[in-house]
Amino acid sequence: MQRKHNKDIVPTAKMLRKNMTKEEKYLWYDFLCTYPVRFSRQKVLGKYIADFYCAEAKLVIELDGSGHYTEEGKQYDEKRTAFLEEYGLTIIRIPNMEIHKNFRGVCEHIDHLVEQSLSQLR
């Protein structure tokens, strides 16, 4: 993604990295931080902050808590997704409950998407 990011939200991203949700911690420490392709946490992309971002695979992972299911949350997520997709990024949304109920399946799904993306980009 070549577009400049909003420097005003960098402090917010840093704060979010220090105060991850339990689902973000679980996915990060038990899977993404040791994944063979590099992921970043709370990455500023344009005017938004992505929960997890893999530049090499052009993949954004968003973990969705209850706030994402309100009408306002859904509208915000739609705008954000459209903005990020303009830059060729793939956005996947994972409900927080899925992290608890099917962690292995979530990891396998992410792995599949990364491999698929990398094979298309090569």
Regions found by a protein language model. Give the residues of each.
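Nucleic-acid endo/exonuclease domains
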Residues: M1-R122
